[in-house]
Design a protein with these regions (language model features):
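A short acidic (Asp/Glu
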Residues: 2, 45-50, 116-120
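A short beta-strand-to-loop transition that corresponds to the Sensor-1 phosphate-sensing loop
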Residues: 37-41, 109-112
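Extended two-metal-dependent nuclease catalytic cores across DNA- and RNA-processing enzymes
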Residues: 5-8, 31, 56-213
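Non-catalytic, usually N-terminal nucleic-acid engagement modules in DNA/RNA processing proteins
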Residues: 1-39, 45-46
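C-terminal catalytic or substrate-handling cores of phosphate/nucleotide-
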Residues: 51-55
């Protein structure tokens, strides 16, 4: 068997799994509305200008076949795919939650970054599709916690030698950051907080326009 045939089978298998998962989501959540957000190729650019280390731990080598599979998944007409070159998928989901009124909005992702969207009241729940459970929504702002503690998945270090115990006291104004720590904290807040995207209103209009065509 040649390599081309194997690649074609891989693409077909990924597309089949993708379609099956979307159909399952619609059944499990009793809805015909599933919106899928994708990372734009240059979506993280402005964040990396603030924190160059942002997502520097993501290795894309050897994943060309996977990217081709995902490209074809995005082209499936029966799914509502949202992809904008200069925006990350997280930003797109935030915009979707701002744009959609009335309907109950449930974010389906294993990513804790979306806790902030529920905390802001823009979505009602966050469902982890891996554990198959709804995430408990903490009282403390996830933006503040991650800005101090960091986030290894995004290669963000946070404030040095500060952890969850410090955060609990910090939000009660029992402890404080020095000037150098404040600078680190504020940069992390800009990068982590989806509401801090300087282009969020531009994205909102793009999302609204696409929603009218669905």
């Amino acid at each position: 068997r040649n390599e081309l045939a194997t690649q074609e089978e891989t693409v077909e298998n990924v597309i089949s799994i993708f379609k099956t998962q979307i159909a399952k989501l619609k059944r499990d959540f009793f809805t015909d509305k599933v919106y899928i957000a994708w990372d734009g190729r240059n979506g993280s650019k402005w964040r990396k200008e603030i924190l160059p280390e942002y997502k520097a731990n993501r290795n894309k080598d050897g994943k060309e076949d996977l990217f081709e599979c995902l490209n074809q998944c995005r082209e499936l007409e029966e799914n509502s795919n949202f992809l904008f070159d200069t925006f990350e998928g997280d930003d797109v989901i935030y915009a979707l939650c701002r744009a959609i009124d009335n309907d109950e909005k449930i974010i389906i992702s294993a990513d804790k970054d979306f806790l902030q969207v529920v905390q802001e009241g823009l979505a009602s729940k966050l469902f982890n599709q891996i554990s198959k459970q709804y995430r408990e929504i903490p009282e403390i702002s996830s933006i503040i916690e991650k800005s101090i503690c960091g986030d290894s998945s995004d290669n963000l270090k946070g404030v040095k030698n500060k952890g969850p115990a410090f955060v609990k006291k910090f939000v009660k104004r029992q402890v404080f950051l020095n000037e150098q720590e404040k600078e680190v904290f504020e940069k992390h807040k800009l990068v982590i907080g989806l509401r801090n995207n300087p282009y969020k209103n531009e994205l909102l209009e793009l999302v609204k326009k696409q929603l009218t065509n669905i």
